[in-house]
Amino acid sequence: MIHDLVIVGSGPAGYTASIYAARAQLSPIVLAGSVSAGGALMNTTEVENYPGFVEGVLGPELMTRMQEQAERFGADIRYEDVTALDLDGEIKRVTTDDGVYETRTVIISTGSEYRKLGIDGEERLSGHGVSYCATC
């Protein structure tokens, strides 16, 4: 079966893409990952600069709301890890541990990764003076 759209990643960009795609009468599949679903905001406490949340919102709560909205419009969220991509040709192939998805369109929204400096004490001080921020 050739799917309308496969979205790799389930952070704000992935869920936003799935909401707009579903509202456009496509049937998006979101490959959220088996461990890292929700993106970097799942590891964030207070998000104070997201529009519409005057008092702020916790990162995991924001991501849960985005997922619920995506599902409400018809996005199919699957907790699978992508192991390979074949983006050559008209039909793209996205391989997970559970199978292969064929689609004409792939959106890769794998987000960000903290960039560590590799300096002495960085790991030991993580969360105690050294921090990484998903929304800064």
Where do the language-model regions lie?
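FAD-binding core/adjacent interface of flavoenzyme oxidoreductases
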Residues: M1-V8, A24, I29, S36, ...
